[in-house]
């Protein structure tokens, strides 16, 4: 299941219509419909966070569905990758 399908299921389970949901996010219903139909890629981080809050879903869970690292983890991941590569170089 892709991000759009996941969000559509969650939105419907919580009783939000597409127009109401988009209005609360301050975006066009047409744009959100394209996201839910997987025509558009998942939106920018800020919109993912706002949608998660509106749906009562953990932000980390929404980013996982979008196949992204949560913004607060990005630096940690980069640091971990660099440390791993340095350790591999030392070990040869």
What are these regions (language model features)?
Residues 1-13:
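A short, Lys/Arg-rich alpha-helix, primarily the initiator
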Residues 36, 47, 66:
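DNA major-groove recognition helix of helix-turn-helix
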């Amino acid at each position: 299941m892709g991000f759009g399908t996941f969000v559509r299921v969650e939105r419907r389970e919580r009783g939000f219509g597409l127009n109401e949901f988009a209005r609360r996010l301050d975006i066009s219903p047409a744009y959100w419909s394209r996201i839910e139909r997987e025509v558009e890629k998942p939106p920018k981080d800020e919109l993912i966070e706002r949608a998660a809050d509106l749906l009562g879903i953990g932000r980390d869970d929404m980013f996982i569905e979008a196949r992204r690292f949560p913004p607060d983890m990005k630096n940690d991941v980069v640091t971990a990758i660099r440390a791993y590569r340095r350790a591999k170089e030392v070990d040869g």
